[in-house]
Amino acid sequence: MDIEDELPARTDRKKALVEKLGTLPPSPGVYQFRNSSGRVIYVGKAKNLRNRVRSYFRNQQQLYGKTLVLVTHIADFEVIITSSEVEALILENNMIKELKPRYNVNLKDDKTYPYLVITNEPFPRILISRQRRKDGSTWFGPYTESRQLHSILDLIGSIFPVRSCKFRLSEENIATKKYKVCLDYHIHKCKGPCEGRQSEEEYLLMIAEITRLLKGKTSTMIRSLTSAMQLFARELKFERAAEIKMQLESLKRYAERQKVVAGDGLDRDVFAVATGEEDGCGVVFKIREGKLLGSQRIYMNNVTGETDSGLQARVMEKYYLETLELLPDEILLQESLGADEEETLRALFSEKEREEAQEKKNIRFLVPQIGEKAHLVEMCRQNARHHLEEYLIQKQKRGEAAREHYGLTALKELLHLPKLPQRIECFDNSHLQGTDYVSSMICFEKGKPKKADYRKFKINSFEGSDDYAAMEEVIRRRYSGSLSSKLPWPDLIVVDGGKGQVNIAFQTLNALGLSIPIIGLAKRIEEIFTPQARDPFNLPKTSPALKLLQQMRDEAHRFAITYHRKLRSERMLQTELTTIAGIGEKTAFKLLERFGSVDAVAQATLEELTAAAGAKTATAIYRFYRP
């Protein structure tokens, strides 16, 4: 499109946006921003669509970062009017999950985490489910840590004889003796309601206790069970009292494992966030009756330009939309909430209290600065930082693994290799004006260095400077003799050099009867040479295959240079010692191994020198440095 054509189009688009802004209602709802391709790039919620959407287009000089970039890409928008803020919040959450807009913070979905369910049926069962359904059952969770979930299930199993069968225990089925008791009854894991051996009233009292336990009310349960045990004892029902005593002991052991973090016994949720350049982590502590029952992590992507306060609000909205936990008395925060954010959350709480028949509470939001509560927030923040660091390490590893795989796949395709080059060996030569000629061989397996298979070679078949002869020697020594049996064959050989080095290496392999794919990588303009092609070719600078080849070539060069410097240093150090009468290279090297340096040899006592090299040699060295 010519620039003259584009300008009127932009003007028309801006005019259409202005007209559309004038039609917005002052109602709660969700808005979607689209780019010129029609793709949804941002989804937001508002209690007043007119004010919220218009705010993006007023005073654009005050916008910065991601929001400014977003506004420059808005070509159109759509709104969906809802009946309440809570409905807008739910709709926004679902749309972000489905559409994954570019400029929205992406919060990791908890849909894979399990819930505990008390089923809605006569004689309810306790089940684990990963899918929530509105079927009248009572739901708890999600449980982000399987250890916590199984710990609770083990406790329930040790205290309460809940049925595990799938029988439909209607009054008619029980009365007609349709079912028989199973093994659980005989090992005292169930009281046999299927045969009418336990009344529904007694069973539901047990379910009420389990519900109390799952809500974290262990202290209340202990008091209740203690009273019941004492009552049965007074009524001389000692068998029932002993049964409750065993339940109490299990419950107390479970309660002792829970960390007491607040002495006032209140129910609290604690929120904190930690952010990096692009990612963040929110942590929620669930405190019930002063005990820390568990925590939940919510990871976030695309957080660049977002404030900690805004991210904290997003974490809270997601958590309370999805959790089935009982609402707390108090919420401790790392950052203060904005007025709109607090209003949205309170509306959500009211909806949850109504839908889930929870006790109505006037929940307090606090940002503590000192004392026990501030310590809880700081502990939560430290956990968020720790989990974010772990997440970033794993993300980096996943990224590296992906790049390595892409690099190997690209190499296979570009070089028409018969299989993925899982093992690659790379060679490099190093010398200084023909002296101390060395070669290195490094090995990469699955895109990573395998240092145990690195080898270094001191070239000894000629004197002077001859890169081709050095390449012939190192290829021959690697792929024949003892090394050929100690190390597996590579899927690809890379040599540092051009057409000449590649051809010499290729001819040497042919002489050994080997057919291994081989290429050369020239340093100057990163040209790739193969034995079959007359001319080299180049890879794009961003190619993962080129980056992998460069990494290997540079590693081989580093390894060769390090070995070359070591040999040169030893030779230079030995020169001074070998000027002493009666000392050859072997003796000089032995002295350097023993003392570490020429200076240390010079400072050694006559006794130390005698122990290292014998009396005659020691006397010569001692007199040389002490004339």
Swiss-Prot record:
Superkingdom per UniProt: Bacteria
Any single GO CC term annotated in Swiss-Prot or TrEMBL for this entry: cytoplasm
Pfam families assigned to the protein according to its UniProt record, in alphabetical order: GIY-YIG, HHH_5, UVR, UvrC_RNaseH, UvrC_RNaseH_dom
Domain (GIY-YIG) ranges: 26-105
GO terms, molecular function: DNA binding; excinuclease ABC activity
Localization: Cytoplasm
Coiled-coil boundaries: none
Xref: HAMAP family: UvrC (MF_00203)
Official protein name in the record: UvrABC system protein C
Biological source species: Pelodictyon phaeoclathratiforme (strain DSM 5477 / BU-1)
Gene responsible for this protein: uvrC
